[in-house]
Amino acid sequence: DPAFRLPTTTRPRHYQAAIPDFSAGA
């Protein structure tokens, strides 16, 4: 999924909410 490659600031909120480890790590 391309969204996983985007910075946390541009990634959709639902991705950040569903995957906090990606949000914090990226």
Curated annotation (Swiss-Prot):
Expression tissues: Midgut brush-border membrane.
Enzyme class: hydrolase
The keyword DNA-binding belongs to this UniProt entry's keyword annotation: no
Cofactor note: Binds 1 zinc ion per subunit.
Sequence similarity: Belongs to the peptidase M1 family.
Biological role: Binds to the B.thuringiensis toxin, CryIA(A).
Record's protein name: Membrane alanyl aminopeptidase
Species this chain originates from: Bombyx mori (Silk moth)
